[in-house]
């Protein structure tokens, strides 16, 4: 038997580390963000409509974590809410992954938004949202999931509770030649997932139908 030393077996490749809350949040470029908000408002202007914003006194000042939950009625919703926010609040929406195509996906990412897989429990997107909140950012979510949805998902309350951030309800509706965005009083995330989700549903229904 040979005394030659056999080479050590090739080590198995290590499994990539799973993302943690300590990783960096998606970056918002303020100049590109402002450009995206301005450009995406053009369809509203060109159609002869205008944006009517109400309840801005309910929006907490910048520098604090915030979750904005809005009803979903059109493809313009994220941009209408972003434009309605006071200066200094950069809205980072959880957008469906199907939108992240080569061109429009770049635009969305430039604004700091990030994809979510609506087919199941997307743990990665939740962790990304928590990173944004940890850095005192603003996460935007459509709790109905799709346009015109009637059932709210509990993910908003879960993210707000884990991120220790209030939920700012935003009602969106169209009235003739106006898009109306109405912010309501912030909702505390401490009441339990079901209770907070129910309260949010009541507020969104009220704000989206307000006169």
Where are these regions (language model features)?
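Helix-to-loop junction immediately C-terminal to a conserved catalytic motif
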Residues: 32-35, 40-72
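Short acidic-hydrophobic, aromatic-tinged amphipathic segments that line or gate anion-handling sites
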Residues: 53-54, 114-117, 188-189
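Non-catalytic C-terminal accessory region of glycerolipid acyltransferases
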Residues: 2-31, 64, 123-211
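Catalytic core of membrane glycerolipid acyltransferases/transacylases, capturing the structured
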Residues: 60-120
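A generic structural signal for well-ordered alpha-helical segments
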Residues: 44, 86, 107-108, 132, ...
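Glycine-rich, highly charged phosphate/nucleotide-binding loops
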Residues: 49-54, 119-126
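Short, glycine/polar-rich helix-capping loops at beta-to-alpha or helix-loop-helix junctions
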Residues: 36, 100-104, 176-178
């Amino acid at each position: 038997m040979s005394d030659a030393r056999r080479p050590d077996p090739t080590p198995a490749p290590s499994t990539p580390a799973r993302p943690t809350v300590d990783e960096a949040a998606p970056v918002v470029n303020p100049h590109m963000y402002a450009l995206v908000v301005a450009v995406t408002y053009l369809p509203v202007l060109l159609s002869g409509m205008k944006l009517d914003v109400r309840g801005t006194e309910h929006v907490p000042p910048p520098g604090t974590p915030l979750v904005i939950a809005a009803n979903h009625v059109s493809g313009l919703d994220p941009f209408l809410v972003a434009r309605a926010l006071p200066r200094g609040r950069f809205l980072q929406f959880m957008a469906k992954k199907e939108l992240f195509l080569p061109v429009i996906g770049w635009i969305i990412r430039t604004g700091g938004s990030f994809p979510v897989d609506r087919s199941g429990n997307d743990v990665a997107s939740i962790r990304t949202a928590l990173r944004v909140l940890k850095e005192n950012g603003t996460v935007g979510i459509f709790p109905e999931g799709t346009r015109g949805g009637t059932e709210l998902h509990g993910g908003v309350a879960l993210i707000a509770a884990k991120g220790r951030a209030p939920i700012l309800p935003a009602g969106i509706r169209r009235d003739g030649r106006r898009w109306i965005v109405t912010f309501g009083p912030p909702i505390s995330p401490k009441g339990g997932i079901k209770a907070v989700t129910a309260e949010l549903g009541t507020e969104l229904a009220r704000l989206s139908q307000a006169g």
